[in-house]
Amino acid sequence: MDYELIGTPDYGMVRVHLTHGDEVQAESGAMVGMDQSVEMETSMKGGFMESAKRSVMGGESFFLNTFTAPNGSGRVELAAGLPGDVLHLDLGGPHVITRGAFLASDTSVNVDSQFGGSQGFFSGLGFGMLRASGSGDLYLTSFGGIREVEVNGEYVVDTGHILAFEDRLDFNVETVGGWKPTLLSGEGLVCRFRGEGTVYTQTRNTPSFASWLHPFRRGETDDDE
């Protein structure tokens, strides 16, 4: 099926052109608009347990929406909540996706939870990650712009700036020169990738943005005013 990326890189959206027999699955709440000829069905992809793992561990919604155009053709437009870009991948091999990055895909793409272990729990990667496998179109959403990095040897990325990476890469979450420099420098944990493959990074960091917003939140005492 054909697609268009609109509003990139600041406020990205994907417009998918469906014909009879095409199906695209998307995060709950991602639909911006669609033609009258397009139909939407909501389901728990992979059953209750897999949906629960994908939601709790991967930061994605419990339900997925599937869009079809059974009576001909139609368009559906999909976008995420945060400002940023949309990355299209023609999936040819498994990719690991960080928490909250999945936007949509062909139904031929299998997206399931992949536990990150203690490395994932104590890092900006989140408690778990998602693994996309199979073949077809995959759409990821970022916070900020997207940069593609070809790794041949080693490459280090702040965990909050990781969007996705090829599953063939080995990785290890660690500090930058020990805990003291990490605490004093204001830098978080980093992910050291090893091998050959592609890493996709995002130019903004969601945890850092949340920390920046925190002083502007209304305090509980404001409720009494």
In which residue ranges do the predicted regions lie?
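Composition-driven recognition of glycine/serine/threonine/acidic- and proline-rich low-complexity segments
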Residues: 1-225
